[in-house]
Amino acid sequence: WSLWWSSYAIWLKGHLGLTGTELGTLYSVNQFTSILFMMFYGIVQDKLGLKKPLIWCMSFILVLTGPFMIYVYEPLLQSNFSVGLILGALFFGLGYLAGCGLLDSFTEKMARNFHFEYGTARAWGSFGYAIGAFFAGIFFSISPHINFWLVSLFGAVFMMINMRFKDKDHQCVAADAGGVKKEDFIAVFKDRNFWVFVIFIVGTWSFYNIFDQQLFPVFYAGLFESHDVGTRLYGYLNSFHVVLEALYMAIIPFFVNRVGPKN
């Protein structure tokens, strides 16, 4: 999804001409909707184990990204912003913002079931994101529609990979997952440590996300005389940043296993 998400803010503001207020509204509604889908995905996937109906849903959304972005989302944002806002939040929440967490959770279940290191496997996802971000800036400077069609193409590849994965032990994994009850949710909200963690996330990750996804891409691309050059160079910069992230993801599990998580 780095083929379009890494330059999402630049596309919205530079190509579609949205205001800063509209941009912030889009991001906030997208994130709020994704939270609802995350809770749904978490409960359902815990019961499914390694069964893949939700992964199939995500596959179809990836394939439909190109047509949706070009023929539905882009025209609606320019002609009927509110409708485009709602449809986009539902689409991105199902397939990307919450879908990314779903895929991480699914991979973690596979790691425990097949006894491989999740962090090292997850690093390959970051390497893939870095490659996508590198070319995203180049293609965006030509036409953003190229990026959207490429997402659909790779979504079809993802679907074919999904078809090839047939695990005979998924029933066992699903059986090990206990049912989530209403009391479990209430207990979490009564836990003081949970609210301390929420405040920590709001004060760190949330503000960093605003800077990283909304402010910095537009600011950096605007430093150059040509908007296309700025978009291309931002893709290079973002790619290098994610490569470093992937390297740390690959080596940190070995360090954590040696010194312990708390240390």
Task: Show where each model-derived region lies.
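Residue-level signature of mid-helix packing/kink "hotspots" within the transmembrane helices
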Residues: 31-39, 129-130, 134, 242-250
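Symmetry-related core transmembrane helices of the 12-TM Major Facilitator Superfamily/SLC fold
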Residues: 146-164
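Helix-loop boundary and gating motifs at the non-cytosolic
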Residues: 1-35, 193-201, 205-225, 230-237
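Helix-to-loop junctions at the C-terminal end of transmembrane segments
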Residues: 36-50, 140, 247-261
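Juxtamembrane intracellular "pre-TM" segments in multi-pass secondary transporters
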Residues: 165-200, 222-226
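Cytoplasmic helix-loop-helix junction between adjacent transmembrane helices
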Residues: 88-125
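Small-residue (Gly/Pro/Ala) motifs that create kinks and tight helix-helix packing interfaces
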Residues: 9, 41, 131-140
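C-terminal ends and interior cores of transmembrane alpha-helices
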Residues: 60-79
